[in-house]
Amino acid sequence: MSRVKANGVEIEYEELGPRDGVPLLFINGFGSQLTSWPAEFRQSLADAGMRVIAFDNRDTGLSQKWTGQIPDMKAVSEAMRAGRKPEVPYTLDDMAADAAGLLDALGIDSAHIAGASMGGMIAQLVALDYPKKARSLISIFSTTGDRSLPPSSPEAQAALTTRPLSQDRATVVAHAVKGRRSYASTRWPFDEARLGALIGRNYDRAFYPEGTSRHWAAILAAPPRTERLKSLRLPALVLHGSADTLIRPEAGRHTAQCIAHAEYHEIDGWGHDMPLEAIAVVSPLIVDFVRRVEAKKKAA
């Protein structure tokens, strides 16, 4: 792994695949590190010849941390409902600027911009605010932020908003595993042991719940992107699971409806996670999409 300054922020990142491969920037979700998804997912894309760049978002993992008081989430939500600008340490727009800045720091003019969950929200903003940097948009179990979309299930919502009883490793891992189960895929077995081991490694690498809280504030403070997404004119792939109870599949469908000519794939029984079995379904969709976009670009 390596570290660069992007948008004035120290960002930890990792590359897989050939340096001369088609660049794909992967943006992680709420509170998650670049190591939070199975390594096999990024490796599968790299094995297809892509230059895969993943990074720790600001305030998480080994990237630069923020300090200071945690935002009052109730006040942030009330400000948004009242049409006022909420007070938050940073916004999703700032995080999109980090992603664009990382490409600049690596000397990459443009890349396929992929993001999952909150990372999908950030990827949408990269495509909107830095269009020359986005060869395509790949939005994975994410949303437009439209307030009329169905909410998370009570169990999934609780998984995000409740805290473990203590911050020791065993308690944090058990709490996270229980939460992930609430929005896991129904199509494949829930591998508690493997997930617990992954969460434990991430705890050892960089446990920083304060950053997760600030990420949540940034999500709450983000205005809907519905109308802005209608202006996009780039290739877009939207992937969602029918069993996602955290960000409902209606959100994925709505994202695809807002982007002209977007491709939408709703995967039966897939939740808000990436079990090993899902990689064999999701990765080929991404590889095929990127190859078609690149072929069309060369033919133009």
Language model features with spans:
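Conserved HGGG/HGGXW glycine-rich cap/lid loop of the alpha/beta-hydrolase fold
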Residues: 9-82
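Short beta-strand/loop motif that positions the catalytic acidic residue
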Residues: 232, 238-240
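Conserved acidic catalytic loop of the alpha/beta-hydrolase fold
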Residues: 86-89, 93-111
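Active-site nucleophile elbow and catalytic-triad environment of alpha/beta-hydrolase enzymes
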Residues: 212-228
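Conserved alpha/beta-hydrolase catalytic His-Asp/Glu region
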Residues: 170-213
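Acidic catalytic loop of the alpha/beta-hydrolase fold
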Residues: 243-247
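Catalytic active-site module of serine/aspartate enzymes centered on a nucleophile-bearing elbow/loop
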Residues: 262-300
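Flexible "cap/lid" loop of the alpha/beta hydrolase fold
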Residues: 128, 137-167
